[in-house]
A protein has these predicted regions:
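Phosphate-binding site recognition
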Residues: 1-187
């Protein structure tokens, strides 16, 4: 519910619907300067298959699906051919980088929402053990690399990815994949 509310509040596509969405709420009378200023990119990693051998492909498919939804929802803010160019990239990380660099050039803002960031890693740890868990979250593991890309995409002035809200159950995965991810605050 919180992630849905954040998405509705910050989504640039909801600028004309603020009263409809929040008219009876305290926030309607006390809006922040950032309301309806972001394109919203959402992931829910509970949809990722945690079975070894299927994990990375499932992660890529989930991310690609969400990136396509993002492109469809906000294509009107980008140049013609944006979606096609996005799909010419081969991985979730390169697609995310393309979205960020293109949005940055256009001075658009992105708010990234990740629900259950640790769902599949907790399942791996409890079901398949530490070795399988480490493959995804340590060294050159794909999930660790994904968080390295997120950090990179927030580094520097004028980057479109300005905000992230990430939920999970356990700090274990966050500690393992976010070494050096000093752009976060636990709440």
């Amino acid at each position: 519910l919180l992630i849905n509310m954040l998405a509705a509040y910050y989504d640039i596509n909801n600028a004309d619907r603020f009263k409809e969405l929040f008219g009876e709420q305290w926030i309607y009378e006390h809006p922040t300067s950032l309301r309806a200023k972001f394109m919203i990119l959402r992931f829910n990693f509970s949809a990722v298959n945690s079975t070894p051998g299927k994990l990375e492909e499932s992660f890529e498919e989930h991310c690609t699906g969400r990136l396509v939804e993002f492109a469809d929802k906000y294509e009107h803010l980008f140049q013609p051919g944006f979606r096609q160019e996005l799909m010419s990239r081969t991985t979730a990380s390169t697609r995310l980088d393309y979205i960020n660099s293109t949005a940055s050039r256009l001075r658009l803002r992105i708010y990234l929402l990740i629900d259950e960031y640790d769902n599949f890693t907790n399942t791996i740890l409890s079901t398949f053990g530490k070795d399988e868990y480490r493959k995804a979250t340590h060294g050159e593991g794909f999930f660790r690399y994904f968080f390295n890309v997120l950090k990179f995409l927030t580094s520097g002035n004028g980057m479109a990815l300005e905000r992230m809200f990430i939920t999970g159950v356990s700090p274990i995965t966050l500690d393992d994949v976010t070494s050096g991810f000093n752009i976060r605050t636990n709440i």
